[in-house]
Structures are given as structure tokens and as C-alpha cells.
């Protein structure tokens, strides 16, 4: 379907709506307009698509020439929090609203069978990451509590399901009723209240330690309490910060781990080389446990992870923002207030001017770039204007270094302890696309058995 182009002598033009974008699927719209999307991005022209969160306010896809200005803009001009509230209807469904304090805390403080067995590994990853993340964010007491771990794993899915139901069933002018009448919204409030109850003993322990001479706890509860004064009567604010951090970490890290594993299973020759690297570093390590230095030395694994992220990104768009007030870019492009904007991940990840031979999965691509250009750049958690899978600017993922180490640890333990392969005749399943998201399909088995010495 052809695209009508609005011509204007200045960038203050009416941004063109992509024809055929009445569907909620970004993938479907891009397929219908595959040539023009590429031309718009290449020529630096913004365009609009239907917004799944609010069809009355189309989503603006910005060309990459605006990325530098966007990432350096003040929160009052371009806000990820404002985008999240709009996109997931957080204020209508009794969901926790993310705070800048929680963001600062993560950025500043954290950074046996012999036979083959069929296994769907996603929930294994999710539960492992939930416990690991909870140990760091909530401390040893709550990370060992099965109820807390279950809430951390299921809360995101409950929130997303409720958001989708409210978006589909309630017009914008009726959404103010949702917190009181929608079962999902009422359930989210109950979960938040239960989290506050579970958190209370940990809060009291840390509060007592802050008064006395006890050594401070090294977890996000302590870090949050250092940044903000919480009172017993409003512990839900503290638990909301915990839930917000879990929403931002557990399932995205689990999906990235699953996607990397799928790509490893498709390339057993890479798996063998990475296993050799892991064994070598473990043999040379002076510690019985993994150290950060050991993990940093896993350069082949790190390069494979980043190439997997480039080739199969978790998400079709990135650097998602919304502007609380009208904004004018330096070249004169004017964006009305409350406009949701983003940048396309695939187009940058597959740009031959940035990544030569982009349609080829090159496991050592980023290892060579580190060796030839800068060993401190191009690692998995690295962000730049050429690498935006973790976002850009002030709201690039603050926990990406922690997530990188979680993924490495899980893959190392799997590769050291188990042999893995696809069932006969199977390879990586097609990626799941919905709205602007893309995720590896978790509903497929892999074959696994204990590694024989």
C-alpha cells in the first residue's frame, strides 16, 4: 500500500500516518510498508503509526538523527515514566508507579538424569532470576520466601493482562472507574497490599539497624530507605518501589536469557567454544565462586550474547518516551504534548553502515570490535547511539550490568553441568510479536541431560 507523503518546507510538517497501520501490530504494518519504512528512516523523516495504548494518540517513530537530543533532554521534556503511565494505564489499574528514587538506587547501588529430558526453560529462568534479584533488591529474608518470589514472577503478567483488558474494554473517559470495578485492578491492589505486609519485618530490621550501630544491609530496601524516609503507615510506597524494580527486571532478563540459549542451540559449534572459555576461566580463578572479574573475562560468551541481542532483540522499539509538554527539536520539528515516541530497534541493528553483513549471525562480531577499537566498549551492557537495545540517555536500563551477570551465570551453570540440544528436526521457534513487543516463544521444549565427564 502506498504512503502519502506530506511535503513541507520546514520540519514543522504534519507527520505522516503510515497507511495500513490500523492494526495494533508493528510487524504487520512494517510488512505492508517494508520499503517506505526503510526509506523514511534512511532519509531522516518521522512518521506515525497507530498506538496500541491509545488509538486517539498515534505513536511517532523518530529517525535516529533525533536520538542524541532525545537522550540528553530533561525528564520534564521527555519522560520514560510519563510514557509508562500512558502506555500501561498504570494510574487506572492500581499498579505501582515507578519513582525516580527507585531508578537512582539501581543505577547507583547495584550496578540429575542420564537420559535426555524435555524441558521448557523459561520459568526456570524466571524463578531463578526472581530469587537472585530479590536477594539483591529485597534481602535474604524475602528472597527465601516462596510467596514473595511467586508474586515477583507473576505480578508483571498480571499487570500486563489487566492493562490489555482495560485498554480493550474501557473507553478513555470511563477509565477513572477501573480501580473500583475491574477485578484485575482490584487484584493488583491486593497484591501491593500483601507485598507491604511481607515487607514489614524487613523494614523494621533495617530501621532498627539505622538507629543502632549495626552494619547496614546491602540490599535495595536499605538503599531506598537511605534515599527516602518511609513511615510504617505507608510501607506500600516501599513495596511499590520493589514491585516496580521487579517489573523492570525479571521477565526482560528471562526473555534475554531464553533468546540467547535458543541461539546457542542453533549453533552448537559456538557452544563448544564458549564452554571451553568457561572451563578455562574457572580453572584459572582463585575463587571457588564466580567473581565479577571472572565474568568480565567471558568475552566470547559476552560477544555471543550481544550478537543474539542484536539479531533477535527483545522488543521492536526502544528509547520510548512521552513529553509532558510540547517540544521543539533543534531542527524545528514540533511535537505536541503527551505524544508517545520511540525508535525502531531492528532498523538500527540491521543497518549495514553500522554492522557489516547484518543479516548474518556473527558470534564474534563484538569481540572483534572490542579487540580492534576499544576493549571497554561493545560489551553486552554497553550503550551508545549505535547500540540502543538497553535504551539511551538518563533512562538507559540502570540494571543492565547486573542483568548481564545474571545471564552469564545461568548460562555458565547450564553449560558446565548439562548437555543441551533441540529435539530432532527442531530449531529456534519463530519470535512472538505483539503490539511493539517481540519475545522468544517460551512454549517449546529443549532436550537436556546431565553432562557426562
UniProtKB/Swiss-Prot annotation:
UniProt-annotated binding residues for heme: 397
Disulfide bond residue pairs: none
Q: Which InterPro entries match?
A: Cyt_P450, Cyt_P450_CS, Cyt_P450_E_grp-IV, Cyt_P450_sf
Q: Taking the first listed entry, what is the main subcellular location of this protein, grouped into a coarse class?
A: membrane
The pathway that the record names for this protein is: Secondary metabolite biosynthesis
Could you tell me the Gene Ontology terms of the biological process aspect for this record?
secondary metabolic process
What does the entry say induces or represses the expression of this protein?
Answer: Expressed exclusively during fungal penetration of host leaves, the time point at which plant defense reactions are triggered.
Q: Which Gene3D superfamilies match?
A: Cytochrome P450 (1.10.630.10)
Source taxon at top rank: Eukaryota
Keywords assigned: Glycoprotein, Heme, Iron, Membrane, Metal-binding, Monooxygenase, Oxidoreductase, Transmembrane, Transmembrane helix
Q: Which Pfam families match?
A: p450
Q: Which residues cross the membrane?
A: 13-29
Query: Which residue positions carry a glycan here?
Result: 85
What protein is this chain from? Cytochrome P450 monooxygenase CYP2
Lineage start: Eukaryota, Fungi, Dikarya, Ascomycota, Pezizomycotina
Amino acid at each position: 500500500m502506498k504512503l502519502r507523503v506530506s511535503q513541507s518546507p520546514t520540519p514543522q510538517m504534519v507527520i505522516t500516518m503510515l497507511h495500513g497501520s490500523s492494526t495494533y501490530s508493528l510487524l504487520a504494518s512494517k510488512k505492508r510498508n517494508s520499503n517506505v519504512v526503510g526509506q523514511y528512516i534512511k532519509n531522516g523523516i518521522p512518521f506515525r503509526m497507530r498506538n496500541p495504548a491509545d488509538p486517539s494518540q498515534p505513536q511517532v517513530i523518530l529517525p535516529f538523527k533525533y536520538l542524541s537530543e532525545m537522550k540528553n533532554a530533561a525528564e520534564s521534556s521527555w519522560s520514560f515514566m510519563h510514557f509508562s503511565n500512558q502506555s500501561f494505564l498504570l494510574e487506572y489499574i492500581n499498579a505501582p508507579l515507578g519513582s525516580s528514587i527507585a531508578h537512582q538506587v539501581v543505577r547507583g547501588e547495584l550496578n540429575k538424569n542420564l537420559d535426555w529430558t524435555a524441558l521448557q526453560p523459561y520459568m526456570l529462568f524466571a524463578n531463578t532470576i526472581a530469587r537472585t534479584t530479590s536477594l539483591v533488591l529485597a534481602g535474604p529474608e524475602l528472597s527465601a520466601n516462596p510467596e514473595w518470589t511467586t508474586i515477583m514472577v507473576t505480578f508483571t503478567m498480571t499487570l500486563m493482562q489487566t492493562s490489555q483488558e482495560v485498554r480493550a474494554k474501557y473507553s478513555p473517559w470511563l477509565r477513572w472507574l477501573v480501580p473500583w470495578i475491574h477485578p484485575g485492578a482490584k487484584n493488583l491492589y491486593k497484591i501491593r497490599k500483601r507485598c507491604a505486609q511481607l515487607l514489614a519485618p524487613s523494614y523494621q530490621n533495617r530501621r532498627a539497624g539505622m538507629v543502632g550501630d549495626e552494619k547496614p544491609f546491602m540490599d535495595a530496601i536499605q538503599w531506598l530507605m537511605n534515599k527516602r524516609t518511609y513511615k510504617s503507615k505507608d510501607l506500600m510506597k516501599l513495596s511499590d518501589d520493589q514491585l516496580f524494580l521487579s517489573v523492570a527486571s525479571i521477565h526482560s532478563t528471562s526473555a534475554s536469557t531464553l533468546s540467547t540459549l535458543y541461539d546457542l542451540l542453533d549453533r552448537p559449534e559456538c557452544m563448544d567454544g564458549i564452554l571451553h572459555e568457561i572451563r578455562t576461566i574457572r580453572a584459572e580463578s582463585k575463587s571457588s565462586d564466580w567473581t565479577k572479574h571472572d565474568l568480565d573475562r567471558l568475552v566470547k560468551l559476552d560477544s555471543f550474547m550481544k550478537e543474539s541481542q542484536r539479531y533477535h532483540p527483545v522488543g521492536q522499539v526502544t528509547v520510548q518516551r512521552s513529553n509532558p509538554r510540547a517540544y521543539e527539536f533543534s531542527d524545528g520539528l514540533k511535537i505536541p504534548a503527551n505524544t508517545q515516541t520511540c525508535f525502531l530497534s531492528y532498523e538500527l541493528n540491521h543497518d549495514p553502515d553500522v554492522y557489516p553483513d547484518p543479516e548474518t549471525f556473527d558470534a564474534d562480531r563484538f569481540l572483534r570490535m572490542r579487540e580492534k577499537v576499544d576493549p571497554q566498549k561493545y560489551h553486552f551492557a554497553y550503550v551508545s547511539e549505535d547500540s540502543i537495545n538497553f535504551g539511551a540517555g538518563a533512562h538507559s536500563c540502570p540494571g543492565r550490568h547486573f542483568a548481564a551477570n545474571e545471564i552469564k551465570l545461568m548460562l555458565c551453570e547450564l553449560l558446565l553441568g548439562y548437555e543441551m540440544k533441540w529435539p530432532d528436526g527442531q530449531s529456534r521457534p519463530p519470535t512472538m510479536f505483539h503490539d511493539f513487543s517481540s519475545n522468544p516463544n517460551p512454549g517449546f521444549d529443549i532436550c537436556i541431560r546431565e553432562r557426562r565427564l
